[in-house]
Swiss-Prot record:
Database matches in InterPro entries: LS, LS/RS, LS/RS_sf
HAMAP family listed in its UniProt record: Lumazine_synth
Function: Catalyzes the formation of 6,7-dimethyl-8-ribityllumazine by condensation of 5-amino-6-(D-ribitylamino)uracil with 3,4-dihydroxy-2-butanone 4-phosphate. This is the penultimate step in the biosynthesis of riboflavin.
Protein name: 6,7-dimethyl-8-ribityllumazine synthase
Length: 154
């Protein structure tokens, strides 16, 4: 039986990061975590393209444009959604998730999910680098592994 598995080596890979500006204090921590992860795994800063968009709603369309670039091996989507008093959160969270999943399948390129969806500000803070780690770092780690796996499978 032949088994394929990605490696955690970012050397030679090129990454796109699409990050929302809304909730920028937390998003910036996630972006820093993602970049730190790539660099600590052998990647170079010049091999990272960062795109800023107004909010999480705009993430999928920007991810799609970036992922269509031949030189990009994987894209990391980063944003922070915090539930409010209206159903707006549910609509945005659902559409962003579905949009990113569909793009990854359509484009056959790794697109990882570093979008925090939290019920409270406290939960979001915990996932942006405190109690529950940094979801930007985790999304970058998945992007590294999946980009390497795709290279092996092709």
């Amino acid at each position: 039986m032949k088994t394929y598995e990605g490696e955690l080596i970012a050397e030679g890979l090129r990454f796109g990061i699409v990050a929302s500006r809304f909730n920028h204090a937390l998003v910036d921590r996630l972006v820093e975590g993602a970049i730190d992860c790539i660099l600590r795994h052998g990647g170079r800063e010049e091999d990272i393209t960062l795109v800023r968009v107004p909010g999480s709603w705009e993430i999928p369309v920007a991810v799609g444009e970036l992922a269509r670039r031949e030189e990009i091996d994987a894209v990391i989507a980063i944003g922070v959604l915090i539930r409010g008093a209206t159903p707006h959160f549910d609509y945005i969270a659902s559409e962003v998730s579905e949009g990113l999943a569909n793009l990854s399948l359509e484009l056959r390129k790794p697109i990882t999910f570093g979008v925090i969806t939290a019920d409270t500000l406290e939960q979001a803070i915990e996932r942006a680098g405190t109690k529950h780690g940094n979801k930007g770092w985790e999304a970058a780690l998945s992007a590294i592994e999946m980009a390497n796996l795709f290279k092996k499978l092709r």
